[in-house]
Amino acid sequence: MSFNLISSYLHLTKPLIIDNKSFPSRLMLGTGKYRSLRNASISIRNSSASIVTVAIRRAYNNKLKGKSSLLDGLDWKKLWILPNTAGCETVEEAIRIAILGREMARRLGQVDNNFVKLEVIADSEYLFPDPYGTLKAAEYLVSNNFTVLPYINPDPVLAKQLEEIGCSAIMPLGSPIGSGQGLQNLLNLQIIINNAKVPIIIDAGIGTASEASQAMEMGASGVLLNTAVAKATNPEYMAEAMKLGVISGRIAYLSGRISKQDKAIASSPSEGIFIK
């Protein structure tokens, strides 16, 4: 990245703030589906992500089986762990896994980390989140001092309800998890962004850097992705591309897009000397 771009970015943008916690990067990265732990570690480093999300069920299962884990290989003094409740189908299960996630963060030395990415998934084919279950679980977790980041369908009404009960950020999906279909419901996503008083993190469905940039150009506060990097032909390069996509999209949003016009508007003057 050029020095001028870095200077522009630092001048224009501020850190991402979630529940009074400051994060330099607006890109969050998942830890699943990588070909190897080394591959994952280098990709996370190349992305410059500040927040890394970990599926607590998978982490505990690996521990019980004696398998090595990214949890052991990452520097948790530099990275902020975002435990997630992926795989939970009920409110009760999501709450139980969230509590385990907070305990895991404590063991990694992040004693003030109450973050949880809340997922309640009742649809096994498309992995769409359960809106009712998400709202119920969020109410309980917020009341028990969790910093809740709920994963939801792009539903502006639900997003506002979750904000009003105390969720610290909202994570609407761009398209189904792992599908790589990009941002499918632009209207609803834009409404959610426009109406929000908390950070909006676009999560799921992003397939390449231009789509990460598009999310940021819309005014999203950040982007969370996993499959687009982990399953890329070269994950380590794709992580770098996603970092640059998020940065360029954020700069474009802050710079102010020109308005669309119905007709062409000449960029060169029509007045002046006529030359035969």
UniProtKB/Swiss-Prot annotation:
Record's subcellular location: Plastid, Chloroplast
EC number: 2.8.1.10
InterPro entries: Aldolase_TIM (IPR013785), Thiazole_synthase_ThiG (IPR033983), ThiG (IPR008867)
Catalytic residue positions: K117
Leader peptide range in chain numbering: none
Molecular function per GO: thiazole synthase activity
GO biological process: thiamine diphosphate biosynthetic process
Example of a GO cellular component annotation carried by this entry: chloroplast
Pathway field: Cofactor biosynthesis; thiamine diphosphate biosynthesis
UniProt entry keywords in alphabetical sequence: Chloroplast, Plastid, Schiff base, Thiamine biosynthesis, Transferase
Keyword Chloroplast applies: yes
Binding site for 1-deoxy-D-xylulose 5-phosphate: G178, A204, G205, N226, T227
Subunit relationships: Homotetramer. Forms heterodimers with either ThiH or ThiS.
Family (UniProt): Belongs to the ThiG family.
Listed name of the protein: Thiazole synthase
Lineage: Eukaryota, Rhodophyta, Florideophyceae, Rhodymeniophycidae, Gracilariales
